[in-house]
Amino acid sequence: MLKNKTVLLGVTGSIAAYKIANLASALKKLHADVHVLMTQNATNFINPITFESLTGNKCLVDTFDRNFQFQVEHVSIAKKADVVMIAPASANVIGKMAHGIADDMLTTTVMACKCPVYISPAMNTNMYENPIVQDNMKTLEKYGYHVITPASGYLACGDTGAGKMPEPETLLQYILQEIAFEKDLKGKKILITAGPTQEKIDPVRYITNHSSGKMGYALAKRAAMRGAEVTLVSGQVSIAPPPFVKVVSITSAKDMFDAVTAVSKEQDIIIKAAAVADYRPAVVSDEKMKKKDDQLSIELERTDDILKYLGEHKREGQFLCGFSMETQNMIENSREKLKKKNLDMIAANNLKVEGAGFKTDTNILTLITQNEEVSLDMMSKEDAAGVILDKIKGMMS
């Protein structure tokens, strides 16, 4: 994913420095060329040898390292970098950068960089909230640097509050968002639905399905990485919200209908990957239903057909993609759905085929349009998301 990309990691003096070893390792696994620059204080928290072992590149601390190859190191590395991530970023380094002070390998290199630079502050809450630090971060943002809002939580000093460096996986997402993919969907608004709905029977019970939301979340994540403005309307799932995506959390089919129709007109692309209930209880009990007889009958009524509504109200130039999970006659049933609901494309899969069902990390899809059927091999849902977006982009161009 990151082959031929160079990532520069800047590590400063903070207890969170040890976590950047995981970030360096993750980047290397994605085939990035990873270089690490450390401040002298950072070496008190983690040994440079750790980064050298993980990246295969010399970890630079001293601006005047005589044992390194003869180049103006800070300039040559700055020219190579596709993105810089300074994490953890101490108040000291943030202050230096905001005022143009370049007195070590890290600050001199960043000063010479023309690529995007991300800064992830990590410090005590009182330090983070200090007006001087806040002003310094605003100054850096004014100069075009990207300052990542720290998380809140229990800090190494024993305090609880803002100032905690996000986890390496989150920092990785910022890097991937910047350099992993061509921004070929920039300027496009994409609405994606994901996950199951829940239809209440009483305060304790509800009707739902086995959808995990993985396919919809993969689509949202990949679309955002390719530059789209993404809105994800999601049922109740156990997946972390994708970064750089607006997530609207819903519970019932009615909730999803309202959330989708509120923003559908302004979207360029709508992908409905959610598994929405077709029926709901006609009457919802206010109290828990007690066991009385051996059998219980619940009257059901139809929910609103979201995809049908979208097809009927599709504006000119808007692309509408649905999903179809079948257990028999997959192509015939999916093609009928494509026509009946005025879709541009439908992604069909068979629940009975291993690797294509609910809650799996893989999928086996057939992309069906008015004129063709394209059968895909089994692949990860993230890769399948990329293929779906490629197909949509090709059909819209």
What are these regions (language model features)?
Residues 1-118, 124-213, 217-397:
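A cross-family phosphate/adenosyl-ligand binding-site feature
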